[in-house]
Amino acid sequence: MDTTTTMAPLPLLTTTSLLLFFFLASSFAADVVVAGGGGGGGGYDGGGDGEGGGGGDGEGGGGGGGAKMPHVNHGRYKCGPWVDGHATFYGGRDASGTTEGGACGYKDADGYGAMTAAVSPALFDNGAGCGACYELKGDSGKTVVVTATNQAPPPVNGMKGEHFDLTMPAFLSIAEEKLGVVPVSYRKVACVRQGGIKYTITGNPSYNMVMVKNVGGAGDVVKLTVKGTKRVKWTPLQRSWGQLWKTEANLTGESLTFRVMTGDHRKATSWRVAPRDWTYDNTYQAKKNF
């Protein structure tokens, strides 16, 4: 809990201290957005390995030729039930101090804005909960939808349910600043994003890091695989921390396709989202999302 709040001091482990630590760890990531190249650019996936928007696995990736992979209609994400929790806030009235990193590895430029939250360890789930969206309702009946972008301290003593440490703009949407800590009802809801899924690739040919962001639907990525157009077959990545995924496979020199699975076990495949001449420290955006 930030010292600007009026509630009694929390233990030394605060969202702010966690934020500073993970900001240092994530400072290497770049955010130069490059348009998704070649192929079909992305879309829902039914689990098959056929190419979308190009002919077979050959290099090039033009948008014509070849049979396109059919899109599967997964329907809308089903909201979870309302449960009890509580909310505090950290950072300034303009959300300053909340966007420079965090335990998910997101940065301010990643487009999540001021309506974000650090969530308690159970919801954070060692990074698997990053990117999920929650609707919170205060005693006044007002609601706000936030994205999980950081890890909060454990639940506050004497309060029910899980802890949401909100940015101040999000907190003020449902409660008065002077209250400091308030009971809320919350539920997991669909994430509505602008544009396609984004993949930031950093590292080197021996150790690749991929940040996944701007994911719609369930929002939380639980599995990520990559496929090239020549030597790289479908290869699972391992979670490094937050929404940063790693692989030691050499991905250079090939168009890259990423397949994302979210917490509700739905999949989306971004076909050839990174062109053959992709470079490190750039972000590649698919044409579609969940």
Curated annotation (Swiss-Prot):
Signal peptide bounds: 1-29
Its BP terms in the Gene Ontology are: plant-type cell wall loosening
Q: Which residues are glycosylated?
A: N250
Please report the stretch or stretches of sequence annotated as the Expansin-like CBD domain. 206-286
Record InterPro entries: Expan_Lol_pI, Expansin, Expansin/allergen_DPBB_dom, Expansin_CBD, Expansin_CBD_sf, RlpA-like_DPBB, RlpA-like_sf
Give start and end of each Expansin-like EG45 domain: 101-196
Q: Which SUPFAM superfamilies match?
A: Barwin-like endoglucanases, PHL pollen allergen
Its subcellular locations are:
Secreted, Cell wall; Membrane
Whether Membrane counts among this entry's keywords is yes
- List the membrane topology term(s): Peripheral membrane protein
| PROSITE patterns, sorted | EXPANSIN_CBD, EXPANSIN_EG45
Per the record, GO CC terms? extracellular region; membrane
Q: Which keywords describe this protein according to UniProt?
A: Cell wall, Cell wall biogenesis/degradation, Glycoprotein, Membrane, Secreted, Signal
Q: Which Pfam families match?
A: DPBB_1, Expansin_C
- Similarity-based family: Belongs to the expansin family. Expansin A subfamily.
Q: What does this protein do?
A: May cause loosening and extension of plant cell walls by disrupting non-covalent bonding between cellulose microfibrils and matrix glucans. No enzymatic activity has been found. May be required for rapid internodal elongation in deepwater rice during submergence.
Please give the name of this protein.
Expansin-A26
Q: Which gene encodes it?
A: EXPA26
